[in-house]
């Protein structure tokens, strides 16, 4: 890894920083990429659908409206996300199968763990702006996460004087 969120914050003081609400559950602590979004409530139908599509290094941001009653991501959907090239998942809600999530090469941030799965009712919105943890998450914006926190920017951030970016 050639970047940290503290270094990015120092270089880009206007970057948006998410409130420190999230715990790491995945096997990858640091991850970054353009974001895709899902808004849902206790139904992971859209999360499952997106994880089955090419991720191309994107980060899936799921606004589960902070529900702690059902897990929106488990080992099967996470393994599918890995197989399809997703860099990570940020969930404003819960995950389950945490022992397995920790072994996968995927960034996973969530509020907590909950063993109960969702009921799939085919509900939820895809690629809509969502807002939680004090940050607007807009499809196509970039998310950077590591052990220090979560940063969001409207474009990829340059990391050197030559204009290189993540």
From Swiss-Prot:
Homotrimer. The lineage of its organism: Bacteria, Pseudomonadati, Pseudomonadota, Gammaproteobacteria, Lysobacterales. It comes from Xanthomonas axonopodis pv. citri (strain 306). It holds the Pfam family RraA-like. GO terms for molecular function: 4-hydroxy-4-methyl-2-oxoglutarate aldolase activity; metal ion binding; oxaloacetate decarboxylase activity; ribonuclease inhibitor activity. Its cofactor is a divalent metal cation. Catalyzes the aldol cleavage of 4-hydroxy-4-methyl-2-oxoglutarate (HMG) into 2 molecules of pyruvate. Also contains a secondary oxaloacetate (OAA) decarboxylase activity due to the common pyruvate enolate transition state formed following C-C bond cleavage in the retro-aldol and decarboxylation reactions. Its EC number is 4.1.3.17, 4.1.1.112. One of its GO terms (biological process) is regulation of RNA metabolic process. The keyword Lyase applies. The keyword Lyase applies. A divalent metal cation binds at residue 97. Divalent metal cation. Keywords: Lyase, Metal-binding. This is Putative 4-hydroxy-4-methyl-2-oxoglutarate aldolase. It catalyses: 4-hydroxy-4-methyl-2-oxoglutarate = 2 pyruvate; oxaloacetate + H(+) = pyruvate + CO2. Substrate binds at residues 74-77, 96. It is an enzyme of class 4 (lyase). It comes from the Bacteria. Belongs to the class II aldolase/RraA-like family.
